[in-house]
Structure formats: C-alpha cells, structure tokens
Amino acid sequence: MHIDMGMLVLIFIINFAYITLNTVRFLLVMRGYRYFAAFASVIEITIYVLGLSLVLNRLNNPINLVVYALGYGVGVYVGMVIEDRLALGYTMISVILPDPKSSLPGVLRENGFGVTQHAAYGLEGERLELEILAPRKNERRLYGLIKDAAPNAFVIAYEPRYISGGFWLKRVKRRNARRKKQ
C-alpha cells in the first residue's frame, strides 16, 4: 500500500475547510443571516464534492478515510472557534443577586449596559433580579463586571430569538442619527 502524503494533506485540508465552513454556515442560519449563509453554502458544497470524490476514488487506502475523518473533527472545532470570535447576535443574561441593595445595576449602566431590575424572593429571602441584553461580542466583559461586583451572583445566559423596542431601539436610532450628521 503506497501512502501519498500530498494526497493525505489535500484530503485533510479540503475536509477541514468544508466542515469549518459548514459549522459557521449552520450558526449563521441559526442566527438569521440568510444571505451570508446561502453564499457560504455554495462554497461549502463545492468543497464537499471535491473532498468526497478524492476519498471515494481512493478507498483502497483506509488512511485516506482516517485523514478525511480527522479533517472533519478539526473543522468542527475550528468552526466553533471562529463563530465564538465573530460573536454574532445577542445574549440575554439573567442575574440573581443575594443582596437586594447591590451596586451591580449601577456599575453595569455606567459601562453602557441596559439593565432591567426587579425585586425577587428566593429560598433565603429577598433578592435582586437583573435582566441584561448585550451583544455577544461584549459577553465576556459583562461576565467580568458581574464577577467583580457580585462574586456570589447566580447567572444564567440564553440567546433571544426576537428583539423589539426598549434600550436597544433607542441606542440604534441615536447611532444612526450620528452617522447621518457625519
């Protein structure tokens, strides 16, 4: 059995590129970026057909299949890393604070975050509950502010499907007005 290293590298790179693009495209679809996702899918399927044909035409060498699978696994990982760095969309953070007089809402507002707060009651008494909508690109900074100001906070994050009105609508309108003046 002859091992063609150039072919193995090519198979790995093609499947790595295909799956990386596939992962990013899937996440674009989930976040509603239809046009980018459609464009990515055209490139993705072209790469897929190339890679699959290379492997299917060389099934006599099982190492080709192993390298194809390795490219797949690495592609999924890298695709997720890319999506994490792009940080598309928004995150909704719910924070429950044991101290109803916590300074955290003020700290978050001073740092540009919109915060809705209301009184809550838990097993051990009164609590303060915060709801914060933030772009995912600011998520790590937000978590850092929460951890610094309220290390005992209970934090839950989830991805909103639909956003309308409120703090974000006002902010977007102000930003658009500033751009028109420039």
From Swiss-Prot:
The chain crosses the membrane at residues 1-21, 36-56, 62-82. It is found in: Cell membrane. InterPro entries: DUF2179, DUF5698, UPF0316. This is UPF0316 protein lp_1140. Belongs to the UPF0316 family. GO terms for cellular component: plasma membrane. Pfam families: DUF2179 (PF10035), DUF5698 (PF18955). Keywords: Cell membrane, Membrane, Transmembrane, Transmembrane helix. The keyword Membrane applies.
